[in-house]
Amino acid sequence: MDIRKRFVLELERLRRHNLQELHPLQQLFWESTLRCNVHCLHCGSDCTSSVTAPDMPKEDFLRVIDSITPHVNPNKVMVIVSGGEPLMRTDLAEIGRELNRRGYPWGMVTNGLAMTEKRYAELRQAGLTSMSVSFDGLHDNHVWLRQHPMAFEGAVRTIKLAAADKGLTWDVVTCVNQRSIHELEEMR
């Protein structure tokens, strides 16, 4: 092996070693609220629409972001807003704009129930770059698991908004269970 090849291989080995040693922050999940508009049977969070614990104030969250900013490249850290249900926050677009202004790409995990075309447009204007939508089965099984009669319609509406937007990275998150496993092929 010639010296150039050895040099390139050694540089690559060192790069990989540094990545393992440094383990750079790439994703930051923020559970932005404990409030939720559905009552999922499988949920591990203590979320309800009437939770008494207040949401973390936007200013406190942005202070946390500002404290890590000197130590990371914001463009390489995806901030993912989850909950509860992040759409329960009336200041979500403001938070997104502030993340975007600071150079952070941001996304969210949602059940889609509270998503409207207007809200979607507002979030996209605030810099929303990715979205995961919970979609757990066809109508009856999704409604059963989410414990809300309009849960399926909300998820489908949100998926359609995302699918029509070529600039958004999106996916669906499915909790497969004994009732929905036979529906997977049809859900594709």
Residue map of PLM features:
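Generic alpha-helical structural signal
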Residues: 62, 66, 93, 153-156, ...
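Conserved strand-turn element in the central/C-terminal portion of the radical SAM core barrel
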Residues: 158-183, 187
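Residue-level signal for the nucleotide or nucleotide-sugar donor/cofactor binding architecture
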Residues: 56, 90, 150, 179-182
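Structural beta-sheet core signal
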Residues: 108, 133, 172-174
